Amino acid sequence: MASTADIKNGVVLNMDGQLWTVIEFQHVKPGKGGAFVRTKVKNVMSGKVVDRTFNAGAKIETETVDRRDFQYLYADGENFVFMDTSDYDQITLSAAQVGDAKNFMLENQDVTVALHNGEGLYVELPASVVLTITYTEPGLQGDRSTGGTKPATVETGHQIQVPLFLEQGTRVKVDTRTGDYLGRVTD
């Protein structure tokens, strides 16, 4: 048993017999009344996100999660197949378990998979990835100095907002947590 002081982003909690991972947390000490911890947790199996509040000092049940290196192999319908890079075992995760990470994963990309009792829970990506723009509207001559953006489709099929001067075939760095354009990559 742990207490609410142990709550951090990424901690896996066992609530009502289900595993939930902490997405956001905030310790609140109001001027009147006792302190509490406000959290946003995500069900690791269904992907459902809910707000949950705990009284400060309350006992919570945490679960040990093993994070191991895997390689993303391919998508099979609504499932995603990964290979453990140490022993070459393959596991399959559902689209709900993979979540928004599917928008930034390329085949043969190295990822981290969180495991609990040998079963895959969710995928963790690096903070940013490099992707190639596969489609975007061409920029106009006067667009280069303004700060506007336009939609662009990257090689995973996901659409992001990029500056007007970027063209098809350009490699860009994308934040995997927010989906924001971070910069152009030059080789």
From Swiss-Prot:
Signal peptide: none annotated. InterPro entries: Elong-fact-P_C, NA-bd_OB-fold, Rib_uL2_dom2, Transl_elong_fac_P/YeiP, Transl_elong_KOW-like, Transl_elong_P/YeiP_cen, Transl_elong_P/YeiP_CS, Transl_elongation_fac_P. Pfam families: EFP, EFP_N, Elong-fact-P_C. It comes from the Bacteria. The keyword Cytoplasm applies. Pathway: Protein biosynthesis; polypeptide chain elongation. GO terms for biological process: peptide biosynthetic process. SUPFAM superfamilies: Nucleic acid-binding proteins, Translation proteins SH3-like domain. One of its GO terms (cellular component) is cytoplasm. The keyword Cytoplasm applies. GO terms for molecular function: translation elongation factor activity. Keywords: Cytoplasm, Elongation factor, Protein biosynthesis. It is found in: Cytoplasm. Belongs to the elongation factor P family. Involved in peptide bond synthesis. Stimulates efficient translation and peptide-bond synthesis on native or reconstituted 70S ribosomes in vitro. Probably functions indirectly by altering the affinity of the ribosome for aminoacyl-tRNA, thus increasing their reactivity as acceptors for peptidyl transferase. This is Elongation factor P. It comes from Clavibacter michiganensis subsp. michiganensis (strain NCPPB 382).
